[in-house]
From Swiss-Prot:
A GO biological process held by the record: L-leucine transport
Cellular component, GO annotation: plasma membrane
NCBIfam families assigned to the protein according to its UniProt record, in alphabetical order: PRK10958.1
Compartments (UniProt record): Cell inner membrane
Keyword field: Amino-acid transport, Antiport, Cell inner membrane, Cell membrane, Membrane, Transmembrane, Transmembrane helix, Transport
Name of the protein this chain belongs to: Leucine efflux protein
Family: Belongs to the Rht family.
Any one GO molecular-function label of the UniProt entry: L-leucine transmembrane transporter activity
Presence of the UniProt keyword DNA damage in the record: no
Protein's membrane topology: Multi-pass membrane protein
Organism whose genome encodes this protein: Citrobacter koseri (strain ATCC BAA-895 / CDC 4225-83 / SGSC4696)
Superkingdom to which the source organism belongs: Bacteria
Membrane-traversing stretches: 12-32, 49-69, 72-92, 120-142, 153-173, 188-208
Pfam family, one: LysE
Length: 212
């Protein structure tokens, strides 16, 4: 399928894309958190930020920026530390809001809906490893002798975005149902918020120690 457009082993790529999307990361956790805390609207706003951020990174990967980042340690480190700092900021903000809440009240990070989109977009764009991954993964399924490599890249990128959309939609819908349950489970909600905050701090530490 799509072999005439320079795509190699499309079905193998699709299976790989599914497994890649299923691996939990900061973007996934952020979408899930907002779907639980702010409902389906909050979840899809977060997902939209992730989709657009990923699309930008894929385009930059195709445009050759990934090679520049990989061969310029200073640039890589700047993006890496910005991403780590932002993850740490989000994690600390969640933990602070949770600890500040009184008794068994649930702490909600009641930011405007527009801010949810911006946070997700920044979270997606400040991950230098993502852009390097797109190049290393996509190149395995593109025929370098094909006349239109850009079209091949577009097909692979679109496929990954579609898979991501369905998976995040599943999380968002599930999160919306969970919201109804935790409204009567205040302590459970506080534990969940604390866990999410710690996960973001962990992602920050991991990103800060990654090498190009």
């Amino acid at each position: 399928m799509f072999a005439e457009y320079g795509v190699l082993n499309y079905w193998t790529y699709l299976v790989g894309a599914i497994f890649i999307v299923l691996v939990p990361g900061p973007n996934t956790i952020f979408v899930l958190k907002n779907s639980v805390g702010r409902g389906m609207k909050g979840g899809y706003l977060a997902a939209s930020g992730v989709f657009i951020g990923d699309a930008v990174l894929m385009f930059l990967a195709y445009a050759g920026v990934a090679t520049l980042i990989k061969t310029t340690p200073v640039l890589f480190n700047i993006v890496r530390y910005l991403g780590a700092f932002y993850l740490l900021y989000l994690g600390a903000k969640i933990l602070y809001a949770t600890l500040k809440s009184k008794g068994s009240e649930v702490a909600h990070d009641e930011v405007p809906f527009g801010a949810i989109f911006k946070r997700a977009l920044i979270l997606s764009l400040t991950n230098p490893k993502a852009i390097l991954f797109y190049v290393s993964f996509f190149v395995q399924f593109i025929d370098v002798n094909a006349p239109h490599a850009g079209l091949s890249f577009f097909i692979l990128a679109t496929t990954l975005e579609v898979v991501s959309f369905f998976y995040l939609s599943f999380l968002i819908i599930s999160g919306a149902f969970v919201t109804q349950y935790i409204r009567t489970k205040k302590k459970l909600a506080k534990v969940g918020n604390s866990l999410i905050g710690l996960i973001f701090v962990g992602f920050a530490a991991r990103l800060a120690t990654l090498q190009s």
